[in-house]
Amino acid sequence: MTPVRLGVLAGIVALVLDQVTKLWLLYGFELARKGVVQVLPFFDLVLAWNTGISYGWFSGQGPTGQILMLAFKAVAIVALAIWMARSTTKLATIGLGLIIGGAIGNAIDRLAYGAVVDFALLHAEIGGKIYNWYVFNIADVAIVVGVAALLYDSLIGLPAAKAP
C-alpha cells in the first residue's frame, strides 16, 4: 500500500471512530442524561460542549467566530492534504491522515451542533488534591498521535527512500 493510501486510511479510521463514539455516547448511552460516569478511578465520561478550540480558547465568539474557525480549519485541512500527497514516508502520511481525520471529525461537530463534543476526562488524586486534564474526544487523540508521528518522523525517523 502506498504511503498516501495509508494516510487516507488512517484519516478515515480516525474520523469514523470519532463520529461513532460521539453518536453512541450522545444518543445510545445518553451521556447528557447520566452526567459524570466513572469508568476507571482515573477516567470519567462527562459531556462537554466546546465552542472554542483547544482548552476552550476562543469560546463564546458567536456565529461569526464559528464560521471563522470552520474556514480556518478548512484551509488547514487542504494544506495538510497537500502535504500528505507530497510526503514520502509512511509514518508522516499516517500522522497527517490522523490529523486530517481528527480535524474533520471536530468540524462535523461544529457544523452539526455548533460546538465540539468532548467526553473523556482523565484525572488523578495526589496528596488529597485532584488534578484534571482537559475533556477531550477521539478526534483530539488522533490529532495528538498524528503530531507525535510527524515529530518522530522528522526528528528520528528513517530518511525517505530516494526515487531512482
Swiss-Prot record:
One GO CC annotation: plasma membrane
Predominantly, its location class is membrane
Q: How does it sit in the membrane?
A: Multi-pass membrane protein
Pathway where it operates: Protein modification; lipoprotein biosynthesis (signal peptide cleavage)
The membrane-spanning stretches of this chain are 6-26, 39-59, 65-85, 88-108, 141-161
User: Which residues are catalytic?
Assistant: D118, D140
InterPro entries reported in the protein's UniProt record: Peptidase_A8
| Record GO terms (molecular function) | aspartic-type endopeptidase activity
Query: What does the UniProt keyword field contain?
Result: Aspartyl protease, Cell inner membrane, Cell membrane, Hydrolase, Membrane, Protease, Transmembrane, Transmembrane helix
The subcellular localization recorded is: Cell inner membrane
Reported EC number(s) for this entry are 3.4.23.36
Biological process terms from the Gene Ontology for this record are: proteolysis
PANTHER family on file: LIPOPROTEIN SIGNAL PEPTIDASE
The Swiss-Prot or TrEMBL record describes its family as follows: Belongs to the peptidase A8 family.
Q: What does this protein do?
A: This protein specifically catalyzes the removal of signal peptides from prolipoproteins.
What NCBIfam families does the entry give? lspA (TIGR00077)
* Matching HAMAP family: LspA (MF_00161)
Q: What is this protein called?
A: Lipoprotein signal peptidase
Query: What organism, scientifically named, is this protein from?
Result: Rhodopseudomonas palustris (strain ATCC BAA-98 / CGA009)
